[in-house]
Amino acid sequence: MLTARRLSLLLFALLWAGALQGQGIQQTKGSFQDKFRQLDEVLPTANVYRNAAGAPGHEYWQQEVDYNIEAVLDEDNQRLSATEIIRYQNNSPDTLTYLWFQLDQNRFRSDSMAEMSGTFNGSSPDADSNDPARISLGQLRALQYQSDANLGHQINAVSDSRENALAHTVVGTLMRVDLLEPLRPGDDVELRIDFEYNIVNGDVLSPRGGYEHFPEDERDGGNYIFALSQWFPRLVAYTDYEGWTNKEFLGSGEFTLEFGDYEVSMTVPADHIVSATGELQNPGDVLTREQRDRLEEAQSAARPVYIVTPDEALDNEREGSAQTATWRFAAENVRDFAWASSRKFIWDAKGHQQPGADQETVMAMSFYPKEGGTLWSDYSTEVVIHTLEVYSRFSFDYPYPTAQSVNVGFVGGMEYPMITFNGPRTELQEDGSRTYSLAEKRFLIGVVIHEIGHFYFPMIVNSDERQWTWMDEGLNSYLDSVAGREWDAEIPWGVEPRYITDYMESQNQVPVMTQSDSVLRLGPNAYSKPATAINILRETIMGRELFDFAFKEYSRLWAFKRPTPA
């Protein structure tokens, strides 16, 4: 028989044991994370479009969009007007009732989402919190310019091939065009869009494309360099993994586009020289006999040949012309089209030979004003060729007929198919000469390698830049460091682990998978961190032989296709 005291002790012991047992069960999960767990739980399920081996599936598809564009450049008013005829081929298994277009020039409107969602950063991080915020004169000028300049695409008409008007709705930097009939799998549709816009002043807003004014030139009113990019309404990509990739263009995130063929004509002042995606179709209409002979000579020359000499460019600068000329370009299987136009351009070229390749001769070319000087004539075209040699060795033969580097002062560096805009220039000295420092030389070499490298990633290996920035910037930063070290091993190319440790120790990092408009520090996160990781993978974990085989196989499999991270 239990006494009351013994019964109390027994009940206490049972309760205590139960409590201990409950605590033990709660603790079994712990905080352990298996760093070597299988990836099956995070990788997407393989399908007929993207197989489990990481290659395009047996039913892989992508859309095709062909453009025929006629554009007119109004230099005096810095305005562009154009008509584009678009053929959209629906290779998807889906029926489409509307199409989405990108109107990237609308990003510069004062009421754009980019401007309305931007935050004011008027003080340095080290400023006293009690100090009033400051706005720079440049920021104030930019705000006033956007308010006054009437920027953005003006869409004048949208119609089909039978000239039926099509309903269209503009939403920020996007436009939805409603089709009169559903576009079924395997069918195509033709549309026409008439548009115009005021070209952005690059010195004020530092955009990816716009105009640069040289008011000190002898010509009355000065001269201009026009760099035209994101200039025409472009089809939004329609993909197997996301459908319409219609994210708003906020500025940081770049572009997701479809491949197609382009025929583009640009009517410009008669003394302008035009550089563009593709190949010039009418040299007899726009170049002198001597310039055409030089261009032919350059194909097999041992060093770059002037197509337009510095003296000829200087004569163009001084005079100006009231006449116009139309340059016609064609490009096959490209995902975009950009061009540059100016009477200031010096033009040099040299043929790059690829024996046995489908494109055996590639014309490497540079276009630059006198402000580029000997820095550009000494290095730009040769660096273009060096980059093609190195990247082709690690991936595939360069498939296009031209590779161009254009000096645009307000663009640090930007790439499009077959053409890049690069910023470094010489410094004007008191005696009128132009010189450049070692740092400026290295900057030009580095930026040309990086931007020409983008011809491969993502202009050919067509990853989604806005969604997964690291897939083009990280891979390209890794490979540009390889090309850079082969050019000059003394230049610090920045992919060794020691260059990323400070960032890796910093606070508020986000995953490299973060969408580009949401990254806190785009440079370290999308460029340096993945480039360093790839470098470690090649040099330490896999070894060069195994890594180089895998990298080349990835490049080959996804050339002219759209890879995703998995």
Placement of each model-derived feature along the sequence:
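A surface-exposed beta-strand-loop module
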Residues: I25, E70, N77-R79, Q89, ...
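N-terminal, polar/Ser/Thr-rich
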Residues: G22-L80, S229
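Hydrophobic alpha-helical and helix-loop surface patches within well-folded domains
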Residues: Q21-G22, F32-R50, F329, E360, ...
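Short, hydrophobic/aromatic-enriched beta-strand segments in well-ordered soluble domains
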Residues: E84-I86, N90, L103-Q105, D187-N201, ...
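Ligand-binding face of N-terminal immunoglobulin V-set domains in extracellular IgSF glycoproteins
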Residues: L80-R107, S112
